[in-house]
Amino acid sequence: MDLVDPRAERYATAHTTPHTPATAAAASWTDANSGAPQMASALVESRLLAALVTVGAARRVLEVGTFTGVGALALAERIAPGGTVITIESDPAHAEAARRHIDASPVADRIELLVGDARELVGKLDGPFDLVFLDAWKSDYIDYYEAVVPKLSDRGVLVADNVLARGQVLEGERGHALKAFNEHVQADPRVDNVLLTVGDGLMLAWRTA
């Protein structure tokens, strides 16, 4: 299901600040070689993440689900001076590709790439985080969410990707895991939230208590 008219998506992309050389190189490689280019952060989404980092003056960022590194690079390029992006990838092959793209970029010193199960690794990380981006196993989103919400800073924002599941959240039992996640966030008294129809759906949540 196309959630947004493809013509509108192309128009939005054409009227968005282009990729930097580093994110462009990673995105181009991903399109040609990954076998699943839709898993990478698209331009509009990457620029939205960069905007959140910029306006929030984020210094500590956590990304769960590195894939080939496009999102991590977009985040690191706009992080505040002295800041760090910690990014977690469970697939060693994806992590290897991400490492090549990160090492070839001018922001490699701002990115810490961890390889392993995010459910275990997140619990070992110290907060607070000014921005958390979830883009990993959708069935584990609630677990990731519960692990990171207590580690958000006072001004911290959590962003979860693909929460509309290509429209499957609207169709009976399909998209069950993401429907459960969306309802979980909506019912959480600790946060306010907004669900955006950007890309495949972005859930933003920020602490109020």
What are the residue ranges of the model-derived segments?
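A short alpha-helical cap/connector motif
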Residues: 1-131, 138-159, 163-209
